[in-house]
From Swiss-Prot:
Consequence of changing residue 1363 to F: Loss of phosphorylation site. Slightly reduced autophosphorylation
Disease in which the protein is involved: Lymphatic malformation 1: A form of primary lymphedema, a disease characterized by swelling of body parts due to developmental anomalies and functional defects of the lymphatic system. Patients with lymphedema may suffer from recurrent local infections. LMPHM1 is an autosomal dominant form with variable expression and severity. Onset is usually at birth or in early childhood but can occur later. Affected individuals manifest lymphedema, predominantly in the lower limbs, and hypoplasia of lymphatic vessels. Additional features are hemangioma and nail dysplasia or papillomatosis.
Tissue expression pattern: Detected in endothelial cells (at protein level). Widely expressed. Detected in fetal spleen, lung and brain. Detected in adult liver, muscle, thymus, placenta, lung, testis, ovary, prostate, heart, and kidney.
Disulfide cross-links: 51-111, 158-206, 252-310, 445-534, 466-486, 578-653, 699-751
Catalytic activity: L-tyrosyl-[protein] + ATP = O-phospho-L-tyrosyl-[protein] + ADP + H(+)
Glycosylated residues, chain numbering: 33, 104, 166, 251, 299, 411, 515, 527, 594, 683, 690, 758
Spans annotated as Disordered: 1291-1331
Listed EC numbers: 2.7.10.1
Residues covered by the Protein kinase domain: 845-1173
Species of origin: Homo sapiens
Name the record gives this protein: Vascular endothelial growth factor receptor 3
Gene: FLT4
């Protein structure tokens, strides 16, 4: 195929070269052995003509239209063409042989170069005209129709076989003789006749005489035609597509002058093979003639594809029209993007096209969709046209194409991004035009656009006029807004001297469902009028808001003042001042409302409008104060020298807006109180007072005007002094510690302008002053002593209740603390927040999609610009509150921030990166982002990709070993290598996070999941929990859902308390009003509400079960109810997953020890798992893979895989395990037999072995359960508060054993349900062991100090087979 294509290419180049030579006339023509132009032979003779040339040759003669393509072809009708011997100058030679020629062989014999298209006489061809004389048939033409038009002359083709004859032309009415002018004879072409001579002829014949005999040629029927062709059309106009086997029909139509004649000819690929036929048609119209030729080919094939040319000729004009015919073997649909998958437009565009490159046959059905919804209307499959593009036009547009008959379907999607010019929303609402002097003002611009503008620029200029110009309105089409054209704008800075700037902040805020850019300029002190503008722009436009910041000394620019301002009394002078700023208002007027106009005829109050206040009020004469030079306000004063009751009423000041000419008014009501004489409401009475007692006398008065009150004693003016007080406008007289000289006559005198009134009384004093002084001393001393003791008791109580500062700070390091002991708010008071280190600018944080919602918070993916040194943009997770969060929720998130700061950074903990705490926006806590989500979902998704024997790359193994080595180095040198470990892996992780997808070293979704990965995840979780334990932090909810997976196989412990909706999480069970993860909780946490690091170790064992079951839900098929809690406390445990090796099973069982003290510490777990990850067990992995153990049966398909971790890994690890784990080691093969810690008795630890019974042997009460193991819900698992109270009550009342002495070992059993559902007590030693319960963590009872025991515990496994 390739060789043939190369050969064709060379041939094409050669032909092109030859064509070029021909066009330049530089080619040597072929030569004939007959040199004369005409050669004459007789009928029956043989003809032999040889031709030589420089290139391959071919012959053409009257007996054949074309020479054979290759080789020789013998035929008596067509003659014989043979090769002959050439010469050096002309190596190619062809000879043409004709035997027994006859008259019809008369004609032109042409020799030409075979591979050159152009036949040019004397250049690429040579010819000779041969006459074959037949004296019995001198004329050789056939009957034909001769089309005669209005041209000057035309040929009558009377061809002869004998040259030199005398020929005349005869019609039905005349004979024409050649005269060399109007009638000319040519032996080769016939008779050339002037057209006007033929208009009356019906037919024409040529006549000659040879010897004594006359000969006539075949007649030519004369048809007089028009000679103008108007147009030609080939239908279908466009290229025609067909399938193999279909019919091709082409219609070539010519519009010509009336009664015109046209000769049609077709050129197409199948013409030589005589495929198809064309049929002429003629339709005469009133003004013209339509002539058609219809080409039809049945059952088209691949050979019929190509160019089809229709040629029309009337002898004067030649028309040509062509089309392409494409033949397909099978139906097909091909669609591609024409301009790429993402197209951009601008809001407001009148027309936008979404084009695609479509090739299909037959034409398919199609439908356009936008964001999954079908679009109505008529559309084209080649382009979707959108009119009046808006922001709502943004979306994904999908073109669906289908051919139901052929079963073909194709889809293509295009993303349209509509860019929106920025708009400032404050322009839509009216803003104040006047601002009070010395006030604090905030100017705000809220902008929205696509793309979102990231910044808003502020400018200012002095208060001077600006020119106005017209600009197209962005909000009202076909309208224009008048915009001021101002110059001399300056950038606003915080050091602006005109009006002091307090702050200038810009941030992104989620408003009305959109992210908008908000900028606030706070002016600390408005002193000077100025013009401000905010400018916002993006790549498709710009918008600006002009703010006229006019500063005035008059509040709101218009006010009324009254002097005096308090209640008016009859006779006082009153001054009403109406002040208005001259910049905004003019035409000040005073009115007094008529009382009759305030109510209608029915007494209902009228609503008065400032626009027509003059209709309801009486104008008043007032004086306009003179305005000082430079002042911008006017004051219209209304003065009343002596106010009287008739002046009481409503006074209105009316002003007019300078620009809008609207009327504005303020109303002031004057209330006038008439004067009246004072009167006493209570007279003074005589009093008898003891020495040192208190004395109080009241002179209560009434009157319209506050009168003056004066006190006299024994007709002398009484004034205030030490021990004598006058209060309540002198109406009350008080004397403290009365003495003998205070006795006498007291007079109260009350006066005003209308008159005076008096009242008097006598005061008598009895007793001795010495006795009174002693009583005072005793009372004061008693009070001082009582206060002293009260303060002392208060200090003692506070010291007992509040621990020392250091104790509180140390204890708070445990994040999960009982709030009943120390409230969370009080704990956080001792943790600081360093804004200089952790505060991150809001404008460099771009919020993205929501990762999770909670009851009152959410976690959002975001892009932080410059949060790490040396990086431009990092993906982070942002914890924030929902809208409408309460103050307590805000304090809770702030507490979490302080706790994260205090804990510090660690590789295997989700670390704090920064925070946004400033009041300009919501509180946001920025933490690391883990791209692979939580470990539980990741393991489930990777089950199909689990390949236990897959080889890890040297880089991955090196990374695993580095984790272990650095962890051990950290343990030997605390506080040093931890930072090295975090820095090393966080740098790798951060580099992967910031690298492009093409540069990312590894994608965990593409790589297989191996046993090494599971051990590595377990090791890292233990490492992170070891760090939290060292910081005295108790997690309390350690589970695979709270473990996140990041780049480079790094896992991180998290607890997104705000993001997790525990009320919907099926892993949680409600306890009263709270929800508890009972499947992960240790028995002491369930029954005693005790949370310690050892209870986290229990949860770590459940987490191991999740990891090695590839994300399954713990306790599959088990109903979480009261019986579950009892069985868990009694020693029943889960059965290990089949992927767990003996070493992993042993770790699980030790983590599930009923005695918290017997559980391993996280430091021990780090050492053991580190040995498994790095030790010799993994080095022998290849040997293990060749001898896999048989898998356990499980309903879950992914659990039936063959475990490839070696059994001897566990045995090898057991040799290096700490003693605390070795003495509970599990036999390699019999993983249903365990040695489990029992109870402690007086510090002595006794352990024994007993056979473990699986859950299949002793199942729980049957329950109906539906659902998968992975998504096991806790429907019906909610334990009400009453149920927990019953459990706790039993756990206090039931004394499961009675230990009477150190030497006695008493068996204690608990009832188990029998086959009928009744509870029975197991016999001693049943099923291979006795049941004992630990007094502190097992039975949940309260034994006396004498109680002690030393039993062995029997432990039952929950197995997934029970499901």
């Amino acid at each position: 195929m390739q060789r043939g294509a190369a050969l064709c290419l060379r041939l094409w180049l050669c032909l092109g070269l030859l064509d070029g030579l021909v066009s330049g006339y530089s080619m040597t023509p072929p030569t004939l052995n007959i040199t004369e132009e005409s050669h004459v032979i007789d009928t029956g003779d043989s003809l032999s003509i040889s031709c030589r040339g420089q290139h391959p040759l071919e012959w053409a003669w009257p007996g054949a239209q074309e020479a054979p393509a290759t080789g020789d072809k013998d035929s008596e009708d067509t003659g014989v063409v043979r090769d002959c011997e050439g010469t050096d100058a002309r190596p190619y030679c062809k000879v043409l042989l004709l035997h027994e020629v006859h008259a019809n062989d008369t004609g032109s014999y042409v020799c030409y170069y075979k591979y050159i298209k152009a036949r040019i006489e004397g250049t690429t061809a040579a010819s000779s005209y041969v006459f074959v004389r037949d004296f019995e048939q001198p004329f050789i033409n056939k009957p034909d129709t001769l089309l005669v038009n209005r041209k000057d002359a035309m040929w009558v083709p009377c061809l002869v076989s004998i040259p030199g004859l005398n020929v005349t032309l005869r019609s039905q009415s005349s004979v024409l003789w050649p005269d060399g002018q109007e009638v000319v004879w040519d032996d080769r072409r016939g008779m050339l006749v002037s057209t006007p001579l033929l208009h009356d002829a019906l037919y024409l014949q040529c006549e000659t005489t040879w010897g004594d005999q006359d000969f006539l040629s075949n007649p030519f029927l004369v048809h007089i035609t028009g000679n103008e062709l108007y147009d030609i059309q080939l239908l279908p106009r466009k290229s025609l597509e067909l399938l193999v086997g279909e019919k091709l029909v082409l219609n070539c139509t010519v519009w010509a002058e009336f009664n015109s004649g046209v000769t049609f000819d077709w050129d197409y690929p199948g013409k030589q093979a005589e495929r198809g036929k064309w049929v002429p048609e003629r339709r005469s119209q009133q003004t013209h003639t339509e002539l058609s030729s219809i080409l039809t080919i049945h059952n088209v094939s691949q050979h019929d594809l190509g160019s089809y040319v229709c040629k029309a000729n009337n002898g004067i004009q030649r028309f040509r029209e062509s089309t392409e015919v494409i033949v397909h073997e099978n139906p097909f649909i091909s669609v591609e993007w024409l301009k790429g998958p993402i197209l951009e437009a601008t809001a407001g565009d009148e027309l936008v096209k979404l084009p695609v490159k479509l090739a299909a046959y037959p034409p398919p059905e199609f439908q356009w969709y936008k964001d999954g919804k079908a679009l109505s209307g008529r559309h084209s499959p080649h382009a979707l046209v959108l009119k009046e593009v808006t922001e709502a036009s943004t979306g994904t547009y999908t073109l669906a194409l289908w051919n139901s008959a052929a079963g073909l379907r194709r889809n293509i999607s295009l993303e349209l991004v509509v860019n929106v010019p920025p708009q400032i929303h404050e322009k839509e609402a009216s803003s104040p035009s006047i601002y009070s002097r010395h006030s604090r003002q905030a100017l705000t611009c809220t902008a929205y656009g696509v793309p979102l503008p990231l910044s808003i620029q502020w400018h200012w200029r002095p208060w001077t006029p600006c020119k106005m110009f017209a600009q197209r309105s962005l909000r009202r089409r076909q309208q224009q807004d008048l915009m001021p054209q101002c110059r001399d704008w300056r950038a606003v800075t915080t050091q602006d001297a005109v009006n002091p700037i307090e702050s200038l902040d810009t941030w992104t805020e989620f408003v009305e469902g959109k992210n908008k850019t908000v900028s606030k300029l706070v002016i600390q002190n408005a002193n000077v009028s100025a013009m401000y503008k905010c400018v916002v722009s993006n790549k498709v436009g710009q918008d600006e808001r002009l703010i006229y910041f006019y500063v005035t000394t008059i509040p709101d620019g218009f006010t009324i003042e009254s002097k005096p301002s308090e209640e008016l009394l009859e006779g006082q002078p009153v001054l009403l001042s109406c002040q208005a700023d001259s910049y905004k208002y003019e035409h000040l007027r005073w009115y007094r409302l008529n009382l009759s106009t305030l109510h209608d005829a029915h007494g209902n109050p009228l609503l008065l409008d400032c626009k027509n206040v003059h209709l309801f009020a009486t104008p008043l004469a007032a004086s306009l104060e003179e305005v000082a030079p430079g002042a911008r306000h006017a004051t219209l004063s209304l003065s009343i020298p002596r106010v009287a009751p008739e002046h009481e009423g409503h006074y209105v000041c009316e002003v007019q807006d300078r620009r809008s000419h609207d009327k504005h008014c303020h109303k002031k009501y004057l209330s006038v109180q008439a004067l009246e004489a004072p009167r006493l409401t209570q007279n003074l009475t005589d009093l008898l007072v003891n020495v040192s007692d208190s004395l109080e006398m009241q002179c209560l008065v009434a009157g319209a005007h506050a009168p003056s009150i004066v006190w006299y004693k024994d007709e002398r003016l009484l004034e205030e002094k030490s021990g004598v007080d006058l209060a309540d406008s002198n109406q009350k007289l008080s004397i403290q510690r009365v003495r003998e000289e205070d006795a006498g006559r007291y007079l109260c005198s009350v006066c005003n302008a209308k008159g005076c009134v008096n009242s008097s009384a006598s005061v008598a004093v009895e007793g001795s002053e010495d006795k009174g002084s002693m009583e005072i001393v005793i009372l004061v001393g008693t009070g001082v002593i009582a206060v002293f003791f009260w303060v002392l008791l208060l200090l003692i109580f506070c010291n007992m209740r509040r621990p020392a500062h250091a104790d509180i700070k140390t204890g708070y390091l445990s994040i999960i603390m009982d709030p009943g002991e120390v409230p969370l708010e009080e704990q956080c008071e001792y943790l600081s927040y360093d804004a200089s280190q952790w505060e991150f600018p809001r404008e460099r944080l771009h919020l993205g999609r929501v990762l999770g919602y909670g009851a009152f918070g959410k976690v959002v993916e975001a892009s932080a610009f410059g949060i790490h040194k040396g990086s431009s943009c990092d993906t982070v997770a942002v914890k924030m509150l929902k809208e409408g969060a309460t103050a307590s929720e805000h304090r809770a998130l702030m507490s979490e921030l302080k706790i994260l700061i205090h804990i510090g950074n660690h590789l295997n903990v989700v670390n704090l990166l920064g925070a946004c705490t400033k009041p300009q926006g919501p509180l946001m806590v920025i933490v690391e982002f883990c791209k692979y989500g939580n470990l539980s979902n990741f393991l489930r998704a990777k089950r199909d990709a689990f390949s236990p024997c897959a080889e890890k790359s040297p880089e991955q193994r090196g990374r695993f070993r580095a984790m272990v080595e650095l962890a051990r180095l950290d343990r030997r040198r605390p506080g040093s290598s931890d930072r090295v470990l975090f820095a090393r892996f966080s740098k790798t992780e951060g580099g992967a996070r910031r690298a492009s997808p093409d540069q990312e070293a590894e994608d965990l979704w593409l790589s297989p999941l191996t046993m090494e990965d599971l051990v590595c995840y377990s090791f890292q979780v233990a490492r992170g929990m070891e760090f939290l334990a060292s910081r005295k932090c108790i997690h309390r909810d350690l589970a695979a859902r709270n473990i996140l997976l990041s780049e480079s196989d790094v896992v991180k412990i998290c607890d997104f308390g705000l993001a997790r909706d525990i009320y919907k999480d099926p892993d949680y069970v409600r306890k009263g009003s709270a929800r508890l993860p009972l499947k992960w909780m240790a028995p002491e946490s369930i029954f005693d509400k005790v949370y310690t690091t050892q209870s986290d170790v229990w949860s770590f064992g459940v987490l191991l079960w999740e990891i090695f079951s590839l994300g399954a839900s713990p306790y599959p098929g088990v109903q979480i109810n009261e019986e579950f809690c009892q069985r868990l406390r009694d020693g029943t445990r889960m059965r290990a997953p089949e992927l767990a090796t003996p070493a992993i099973r042993r770790i699980m069982l030790n983590c599930w020890s009923g005695d918290p003290k017997a559980r391993p510490a996280f430091s021990e777990l780090v050492e053991i798992l580190g040995d498994l990850l790095q030790g010799r067990g993994l080095q022998e992995e290849e040997e293990v893979c060749m001898a896999p153990r048989s898998s356990q049966s499980s309903e879950e398909g992914s659990f039936s895989q063959v475990s490839t971790m070696a059994l001897h890994i566990a045995q090898a690890d057991a040799e290096d395990s700490p003693p605390s784990l070795q003495r509970h080691s599990l036999a390699a093969r019999y993983y249903n037999w365990v040695s489990f810690p029992g109870c402690l008795a007086r510090g002595a630890e006794t352990r024994g072995s007993s056979r473990m019974k699986t859950f299949e042997e002793f199942p729980m009460t049957p329950t109906t359960y539906k659902g998968s193991v992975d998504n096991q819900t806790d429907s019906g698992m909610v334990l009400a508060s009453e149920e927990f109270e019953q459990i706790e009550s039993r756990h206090r009342q039931e004394s499961g054993f009675s230990c009477k002495g150190p030497g006695q070992n008493v068996a204690v059993t608990r009832a188990h349900p029998d086959s009928q559902g009744r509870r029975r007590r197991p016999e001693r030693g049943a099923r291979g062991g006795q049941v004992f319960y630990n007094s502190e963590y097992g039975e949940l009872s309260e034994p006396s100090e004498e109680d002690h025991c030393s039993p062995s515990a029997r432990v039952t496994f929950f197995t997934d087979n029970s499901y």
